[in-house]
Amino acid sequence: MGQILLNLRYLLAPILIIVAGAGVLIGGIMAWLGVVLLFVGLIVDIATKFETTGVGYDSEGNTLGWAGFQNLTMYFMLPIFVLFQLVMAWRVYSFMAFGGAEGELVTSIFGIIPMYEGITAVNLIGATLSSGIFIGIGIIYGHELSHTKGFGFVISRIMMALSGSAH
């Protein structure tokens, strides 16, 4: 069980990125979800004062990390970033198309959270900040893949290009 938890913690950033992207997709006040998640993450980080040294090793010196799982997580982030960019592009388009109005109700998620066609200027700012924060955090995946050769390096360049940083 401990080894599972050690490896599952590497899903924290991808889950936060997906949730922030969903907030931008939903729009309205939810477009600010990424900004809120950043501060929640900072508070948790400061409160725990726990610094990780990696997954660690067993008594025989073998890593407890699942290399395949960790690599798939990094590669999985490329389609997530592409979708995040497309969602943000749609939000900018809907802002322009509806003149800064929310427009019609598209759907209601769980009967609680309304999703509108358009987006207001204030919520577009929230969407932009949320996108910038979490696509910026996502640069880590592109950076780590840039240490590889072949296919992984190509994927890293694409990821870095999506964030506007190809160092």
Predicted regions and their residues:
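Residue-level signature of transmembrane alpha-helical entry/exit and packing/kink sites
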Residues: 74, 120-128
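N-terminal membrane topogenic signal
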Residues: 1-12
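Hydrophobic alpha-helical transmembrane segments of multi-pass integral membrane proteins
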Residues: 73-88, 130-134
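Transmembrane alpha-helix boundary signature
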Residues: 49-55, 82-122, 140-144
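Central hydrophobic cores of alpha-helical transmembrane segments in multi-pass inner-membrane proteins
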Residues: 34-57, 81, 135-139
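Membrane-embedded catalytic scaffold of the fatty acid hydroxylase/desaturase
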Residues: 127-167
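Short, hydrophobic transmembrane alpha-helix segments
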Residues: 18-33
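Juxtamembrane helix-capping/reentrant segments at transmembrane boundaries
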Residues: 56-80
